Amino acid sequence: MLMIPTIAILSGGFSCEREISLMSGKAVKKALDSLSYNAIEIDVDSNIAEKLKKINPGLAFIALHGPYGEDGCIQGLLEILGIKYTHSGVMASAVAINKVMSKHIFRSLNIDTPKGYVISREDVLKNNIKIDYPYVLKPINEGSSIGVYIIFSHEDYLELKDNSSTIMEKMIVEEYIPGIELHTAVLLDEAIGTIEVRPKNKFYDYEAKYTDGFAEHIFPAKIPDNIYKMTLEHALKIHQFLGCKTISRSDFRYNPKNNTLKMLEINTHPGFTELSLVPEIAKLAKGINFNELVKIIIEDSLQHKNIRDLSHVEQYY
């Protein structure tokens, strides 16, 4: 009889995305219960190593987001403890969450990305910004659009300055790309589809991502066929180059006025609630429901023996 391993669902954690992570964890727990897995939810804190040693799970389902969860930290701990885990490994996670590093890699692979640079808090407060309006100011290592500001005018800048406590010591400032918001899902080394998001707010922010009715989703995205194909190619290319595992989501902006596609980032641990984009794309593109998607992730993750294998980079060297 096949032994079903205990699965530890890691959620919560220390980042600004804690609440999102808890939502993801509960959604995964509900799915695993319905699939008859023995699943235990763990709210990650400084005692996580001791908790994991006590439970000794056969697999850790990483439902964490942001720093310590999708940046290679928890992955490194699980490597040391010898526990298999879902999603990408240490290197892919660490590089993907860092928007500066990932943009360098996009360019090295001839994937176009918005122009920008790292800026200090001091320069932001002095309005010493070398990019004209409109521009985007965002954290280097965050997700879920937390701490992202689109500055269309000097009035927007003054409003940002009035809320200066949200400005980090180091951030990225980059050109704003008008047009269409696109998100591409990769599952099991296949780019399965691209969805278009039309937020009711100025952009696809935290509220739009996690509140039903705050954004319109269109699948497949209503863009030219060659651009749609390009989103699939770029998403799969960066997924494979970084050695991402099982699942990822790449984000783009498409400007129909000049027919340009820009890659914004790749997410190795995309949101995993009932409202999240990857589960939606999986359902619409492949007919895979949420429970089935969780099962696919579990089964694929259990098959990986050498999580730290770097052989995927040989073809690019």
UniProtKB/Swiss-Prot annotation:
Mg(2+) 1 binds at D251, E265. Cell wall formation. Pathway: Cell wall biogenesis; peptidoglycan biosynthesis. Residues 103-299 form the ATP-grasp domain. Its EC number is 6.3.2.4. Its cofactor is Mg(2+); Mn(2+). The gene is ddl. Keywords: ATP-binding, Cell shape, Cell wall biogenesis/degradation, Cytoplasm, Ligase, Magnesium, Manganese, Metal-binding, Nucleotide-binding, Peptidoglycan synthesis. The keyword Nucleotide-binding applies. Belongs to the D-alanine--D-alanine ligase family. The keyword rRNA-binding does not apply. This is D-alanine--D-alanine ligase. GO terms for biological process: cell wall organization; peptidoglycan biosynthetic process; regulation of cell shape. ATP binds at residues 130-183. It is an enzyme of class 6 (ligase).
